[in-house]
Curated annotation (Swiss-Prot):
Disulfide bonds: none annotated. It comes from Kluyveromyces lactis (strain ATCC 8585 / CBS 2359 / DSM 70799 / NBRC 1267 / NRRL Y-1140 / WM37) (Yeast). Transmembrane segments: none annotated. It comes from the Eukaryota. This is DNA polymerase epsilon subunit B. As accessory component of the DNA polymerase epsilon (DNA polymerase II) participates in chromosomal DNA replication. One of its GO terms (cellular component) is epsilon DNA polymerase complex. One of its GO terms (biological process) is DNA-templated DNA replication. In eukaryotes there are five DNA polymerases: alpha, beta, gamma, delta, and epsilon which are responsible for different reactions of DNA synthesis. It is found in: Nucleus.
Length: 710
């Protein structure tokens, strides 16, 4: 598109034949009238009167179609998407032009003859540089009396630098050496994370720019973080459509026209858990029915997907965007190994009865999971976190596959990089905690990690307006605790200079503790106010006061850090199914009967013989599977765990992160990998006069549990 042209006004019907030949016949896109008008206006402005004879017009339309297909913008070319794609083409051309100018400037500086002659002597000055075939071979030595050869292809008058055979052989390693891993290490706060909304009609994410303040000194929604009503309306609808699209991508749901009522979702779960899955036949395909389509189909079997919650009568109901229906769970058989709580999105199979307008559930399960790579490919390789490049109004950043491969190789080279995750409830107001921290820092200072994660709460009593026996307010005492931690850290130069200190607040930390008093409050939770952390920020060079939850972009990986007692909340609100209770009763009766026949064998031995896995392992797997299948850090209804409406997207786990550091003090420490996502719980920091933490190596995803008695 180089050169100066006279703009022209092109009638859309004149452009239609060329656009139809390229966009429709070649790329399978359907052009709408407003989209054709936008294309004609741009082509007339850029290519002028001779746009027909200019081959760049065809190249532009082909580039337009390629970007359109890459971004998955659908089949219909409309005005809004045309303007977005054109803006992205402009942005790419601008970046390429800037890089080209910068490269030529650098080459001009490097190839300047005066600068070349003024270089000091070095071993490379006397090396013989072998150029490409057909170019001259010369010995460069400024101090020698031999004439200097300036042949075509030499490094002095060539536009490109020569590449030696050694560099060609090690091209990949040389490229990797140019990457600085610190440029791809980012700590992303939930309140500063870039916003994407999900458009279920186009099945793609839409970037939403942050609102700009009208005046600097005026309070605005951006400052107060007040959500709007639309965010509340779309809160669970967005979750529903994200999970539904994930379900429809599963091979069991590929055929929308066939559904065999005899192939229940329990059998589907068994097939999915098998290692060697036989080829799918048509009878195993399943179809999801909307609730509004149940009317008039009395006594028929259906499969529904919806939000599980209680209605105004206190009965269980299922809700989707088309409507809601009351559930009868007396005969429901749930799949084992998961929790069922109000707010979960579940698959239910059963029979609809028109008389009572109820749905008698025969089986219930969570949606099937999906691996991170599959989800990223399905959404068009979007960089939702902005880890590599931030998105803006004119450009939506995407994950570069080549860069991702290079970063992966760089991760393997940095195999010694490690993260230290301390256990939760680091009560700085207790002397035992300070002793444990001192013991931990003594060991870590010899080999400083990349980051140390401090999980709250950082005080044993919730911070609230009160005075203690010494007439010291709770806020002053809270600040003094962090000052004491800063004084302790000042003795470890390696840690305060080289290690990233990441602090994640807990339920007792301000300011949410003022309202919740240590109970469940709004999520995400804001960072600890700076008025309490001034000394820590002054002593530590790399300190991050993070929100809860928090995300880390480490090279090609995404790591989620969160502090929440999920195990207790899942157990408290888990639905009790009569069929499960009956099964437990029969199992206990069988154990008692076996014990009566053989009194020498204890009940514990009988249980261990039946199931060799410990209860703690089963519970941890149950928690992780529920969390990752729901693809949300808080799969509860709003009355159980309220969330900030317009920040619910920061709690989404779609796509699944590479690792989740879930600090849950109500559950024992565990390490569970599900669908390629490694979930780690360090447990409690102080346990029986011992400091517990975990060393995590992201390159190999290996963790080492440490326990330091003091």
């Amino acid at each position: 598109m180089a050169g100066v042209v006279l703009p022209a006004s092109i009638q859309p019907q004149l452009l239609r034949p060329l656009a139809y030949r390229i966009l429709t016949k070649k790329f399978g896109l359907n052009i709408k009238s407003d989209g054709l008008v936008a294309l004609a206006a741009y082509i007339g402005t850029v290519f002028g009167l001779y746009w027909r004879q200019n081959s760049e017009t065809t190249k532009f339309l082909e580039q337009f179609a390629i970007i359109w297909r890459e971004q998955g913008r659908g089949l219909f070319v409309d005005e809004l998407n045309v303007s977005q794609v054109i803006n992205e083409i402009k942005e790419r051309e601008k970046i390429e032009q800037d890089q080209h100018v910068e490269k030529r400037n650098n080459l001009h500086k490097a190839n300047n003859l005066d600068a070349f002659l003024k270089r000091p002597n070095s071993p490379t000055d006397t090396e013989i540089t072998t150029l490409s075939q057909g170019s001259a071979t010369s010995v460069v030595n400024p101090d020698s009396h031999s004439p200097m050869m300036l042949e075509e292809g030499s490094p002095i008058n060539s536009d490109s630098e020569p590449i030696s055979e050694h560099e060609r052989a090690n091209g990949i390693s040389n490229v990797d050496q140019q990457l600085d891993w610190l440029d791809y290490f980012k700590v992303i706060d939930a309140f500063n994370q870039q916003t994407f909304t999900y458009d279920h009609t186009k099945r793609q994410y839409i970037y939403v720019p942050r609102p700009k303040e009208v005046e600097k000194n005026m309070l605005s929604i951006a400052k107060l973080k007040l959500p709007n009503v639309e965010s509340k309306v779309s809160l669970f609808t967005t979750r529903y459509h994200i999970i539904k699209d994930k379900v429809l991508r599963n091979e069991k749901f590929q055929n929308n026209d066939i559904f065999n009522p005899l192939s229940s979702i329990i059998e589907m779960g068994k097939h999915m858990n098998e290692s060697d899955v036989s080829p799918l036949n048509s009878a195993s395909y399943m179809k999801i029915t909307q609730i509004k389509n149940l009317l008039g189909h009395d006594g028929k079997n259906f499969l529904l997907l919806g939000l599980l919650d209680q209605n105004s009568k206190g009965n269980w109901s299922l809700e989707d965007p088309s409507g809601s229906i009351e559930l009868h769970l007396q005969q429901a058989i749930p799949t084992k190994g998961t929790y069922y709580v109000p707010g979960c999105i579940v698959l239910v199979e059963g029979i609809y009865y028109t008389a009572s307008n109820t749905f008698v559930v025969s089986s219930i399960t969570h949606p099937p999971g999906e691996k991170r790579e599959d989800t990223i490919e399905a959404i068009g390789n979007l960089d939702l976190l902005g880890a590599y490049n931030p998105s803006n109004e004119n450009y939506v950043a995407r994950l570069d596959k080549d860069l991702k491969i290079r970063l992966h190789y760089l991760e393997q080279e940095l195999s010694d990089n490690k993260f230290v995750i301390l256990g939760g409830d680091i009560y700085l107001d207790e002397m035992t905690t300070m002793d444990g921290l001192k013991k931990t820092f003594d060991k870590l200072t010899t080999d400083p990690p990349v980051a140390i994660v401090f999980n709250g709460s950082f005080v044993s009593v919730p911070v609230h307006p009160s005075l203690n026996a010494k007439n010291v307010s709770a806020t002053v005492s809270y600040k003094n605790n962090f000052d004491a931690l800063a004084t302790l850290l000042s003795n470890y130069e390696n840690l305060i200079n080289d290690t990233h200190m990441i602090f994640i607040p807990g339920p007792n930390d301000p300011w949410t503790s003022m309202v919740g008093l240590g109970t469940t409050t709004m999520w995400p939770q804001k960072i600890i106010p700076s008025s309490f952390t001034q000394k820590m920020s002054r002593i530590c060079r790399k300190v991050h006061w993070g929100s809860n939850p928090l995300r880390i972009a480490y090279l090609s990986q995404e790591i989620v850090l969160t502090r929440d007692d999920l195990a207790n909340r899942f157990k408290r609100y888990n639905i009790v199914f009569p069929t499960v209770e009956e099964e437990k009763y029969l199992e206990n009766a069988e154990l008692q009967e076996q014990y009566s026949r053989n009194p020498d064998v204890s009940v514990g031995q009988l249980i261990a013989f039946k199931n060799n896995l410990p209860v703690s392992v089963l519970e941890s797997r149950k928690l992780v599977k529920t969390l990752l299948d729901q693809q949300h850090l808080s799969p509860f209804s709003s009355r159980i765990r309220p969330t900030v409406w317009d920040l619910d997207f920061t709690l989404q786990l779609s796509p699944l992160p590479s690792s989740i550091m879930l600090c849950d003090t109500s559950a024992p420490a565990f390490d569970v990998t599900y669908n390629g996502c490694k979930t780690i719980n360090p447990g409690r920091f102080i346990h029986k006069r011992a400091a517990k933490y975990i060393e995590f190596f992201p390159a190999s995803k290996v963790l080492v549990e440490e326990e330091l008695p003091f």
